Amino acid sequence: MRKLMIGLVALGLAGCAMNYSDIRKNSTQTFTTTKSLEQMETCLIPKLDSETYNGPAINTTVKPLENGVTLVPLAGLEFIDLIKSNAGTEVVYYGEGTKSILFPERRIKVTLKAIKSCL
C-alpha cells in the first residue's frame, strides 16, 4: 500500500516539473478579439479565480508586459498574455504546465472555456 501511494504521488507531481521557460516555449492556443485589454482582464480574472480544483481558491496575479499584461492564475503553472493590438486584444494561453498524468487536459479545458466566454 505504501509503495502504491508513493507511486501515485510521483505520477501526480510529474506535471509540476516544468519551469517558466519550458511552459512559454509553445503556446497552447492563441485568440484575437475586438474587445479591449481591460475588458478581457475584467472578464477573465473572476472566471479564473472562481475555480478551486479541490484546493484553496485561486488568486490570479497580473504582471505587466511591454504591450499588455500576463495573467498568472495557478502558482505559475500557466500564463495568459493579453496583448494590445490595432484590432483589439491578442490572447495567448500557455497551459502546458498544468498537465499531469492523472488529469492531462482538465485544467486546460476549463481555462480555454473561460477565455472563449470572454471573447
List the model feature ranges, each with a label.
Residues M1-L4:
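Positively charged n-region of N-terminal signal peptides that target proteins for export
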Residues G12-G15:
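C-terminal motif of bacterial Sec signal peptides marking the signal peptidase cleavage site
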Residues A17-L119:
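Ser/Thr-rich, low-complexity intrinsically disordered terminal regions
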